[in-house]
Amino acid sequence: PTLAVRNGHNTNQAKGYSYLYWKDFFNPRQQLCLGLLLREILKIKNKKIQEQFLCLFSSTLEFNNSFCSYKGEGTGAVRPIFFNHILKPERTPLENSVWGEPQSSGCFSTLYKTRFLKAKEYLNYPFEIKVNKDNNKYEKVISSQPLRPIFVDNWNDLTNTNDSVWVLNGDSARLPIPDNSVDLVVTDPPYFDYIHYSELSDFFYAWLSPILENRYPEFQADTSERANEV
């Protein structure tokens, strides 16, 4: 990645330690290994599958950089870069294995099993967690039929197509849907100024924008910052 670190609340924390480009967050060996992995992902001809693996690659970045450390004392799991939402370098950074092996933490091969395959399994067997009050144990309860949504890109198709889903990524203050058409709103509350998502998302944007800029206009900007964001 060649993207420079822009000024900001969180990014200035790293710039104070002379981390001026996002590539500086990775040592030369990590840059090489991640670059080789990314090159192989880009050989996948099916773009939908390729982009799923690009999402998995972005998760791998969190656990393979110079800001990682051990979780807890001793040689435990790998603690990723954003575990405490600041960009302060570790005194003794932990260098992880990019590809990994069965007992690894935060590696591409293990994240493939724990995140990618788990998500696919959930689509086939959606579940809820039930708590047994007698022994305080948890169990999974299959809660619906397999999820096989049909993705649409407008309101008319959404209302006229069974089992359809319309995914929007934009300004929630101006949704292109009719008034009084929403039955339920489920929201994840923001953290106000605790986490500066736009600044921190440049960590991933630096790797993905050169690949996706010719597919999606949203990736053509120099950074992930947008003029109308809060």
Set out the residue ranges of the language-model regions.
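Conserved SAM-binding loop
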Residues: 190
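Hydrophobic beta-strand segment of the Class I
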Residues: 185-186
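Nucleic-acid modification enzymes, centered on SAM-dependent nucleic-acid methyltransferases
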Residues: 1-178, 196-230
